[in-house]
Regions:
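Short Fe-S-cluster ligation motifs
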Residues: 34-55
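Radical SAM/AdoMet-radical enzyme domain recognition
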Residues: 46-49, 61-149, 155, 162
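Non-catalytic positions within long, well-ordered alpha-helices that form the structural scaffold/packing
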Residues: 40-43, 98, 166-170
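A short acidic, helix-capping loop that chelates divalent metal ions and anchors anionic groups
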Residues: 18-21, 114-120, 185-190
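Terminal RNA-binding accessory module
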Residues: 220-290
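Canonical Radical SAM [4Fe-4S] cluster-binding loop centered on the CxxxCxxC motif
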Residues: 1-31
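Conserved C-terminal portion of the radical SAM core fold
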Residues: 128-189, 199-219
Length: 290
């Protein structure tokens, strides 16, 4: 689903209270699970990491506990993680998620200072409650703090977040860090200019020396698997059926061969149309009117 209880100044998908998106979506739980099962049956592998994320705050999904529970029933799934801003976490919800089979929480903690946390979230951000929930969760599952380094805004806060994570580890909590580099997105909010990956990793190296910690987080379990075949490829002309409006202005979503195709600048409301596929990377398709 999309939708968010915050309004972060750096949001890559322009979610929250000031969002300019004209359409919201929520995907049925059964559909999500069934399609995920089909994909895993095709890949025919094990040790799968299922990461639950959406264009917004994941914990706003009304059936999040049930979704985790059903994914846990899939034998090939090992890790189940959720990305969250942490503000909706409670001890009860954490316990329910762990009981359902959640193994990891990725929490986008971007500042320790209350005033700066509010500024980045563009909404009141209860930093003390979020810190309390991080401590509680870290005793029950793995927590990865994934702050976004926003140059010129929260540079000094990264030091505080590192020390906060180290303090939890000293208390016996299971916490890791996965610091992210702010990237500009065409349809997102871009309060600053992004820095190069070279400069980003130089900054991480400097922080590693200061805090005596490894900050180059990597997912050791990554492995190759069969790629889902593409029913059509970039450059092809195909006939698609318009289903509904998309999230961008004048965007339509259409279907063909069991796939969704995004069509920008489309003013036709329904019916079949011919489009040229201009993007097929990662099985994400964009078509333009012929």
């Amino acid at each position: 689903m999309n939708g968010c209880n915050l309004d972060c100044i750096y949001c890559s998908v322009d979610e929250g209270f000031s969002s300019k998106r004209p359409v919201d979506f929520i995907i049925e739980r059964d559909y999500l699970v069934n399609e995920f099962r089909k994909l895993l049956e095709f890949k025919n592998t094990t040790n799968i990491h299922a990461n639950i994320a959406g264009q917004g705050e994941t914990l706003m999904y009304p059936e999040i506990v049930e979704l985790v529970r059903e994914i846990r029933q899939i034998h090939s799934v090992d890790i189940i993680s959720i990305i969250t801003n942490g503000t909706m976490l409670t001890e009860l919800l954490i316990d329910k998620l762990v009981s359902a089979g959640l193994t990891r929480l990725n929490i986008s903690l971007n500042a320790i200072d209350k005033g700066l946390a509010d500024k980045i979230a563009n909404k009141p951000y209860n930093i003390e409650k979020v810190k309390e929930m991080i401590r509680y969760a870290s005793k029950r599952l793995q927590v990865i703090l994934v702050p976004v380094l926003i140059p010129g805004i929260n540079d000094a806060e990264i030091d505080k977040i590192i020390e906060f994570s180290k303090s939890i580890c000293m208390e016996g909590g299971n916490v890791k860090l996965g610091i992210q580099n702010f990237l500009s997105y065409r349809f997102g909010r871009n309060p600053v200019n992004e820095i190069s990956w070279g400069e980003f990793y130089e900054r991480l190296a400097g922080l590693e020396k200061v805090h005596n910690i490894n900050l180059k987080y990597s997912e050791e379990r990554l492995f190759e698997s069969k790629e889902l075949p593409k029913p059509f490829k970039k450059g092809w002309s195909i006939v698609v059926k318009i289903i509904c409006d998309g999230r961008l202005k004048n965007e339509k979503l259409a279907v063909s061969c069991g796939r969704v195709i995004s069509i920008p600048n489309c003013h036709k409301e329904k019916g079949d149309i011919k489009v040229k596929i201009v993007r097929d990377k990662h099985n994400i398709f964009v078509g333009v009117l012929k």
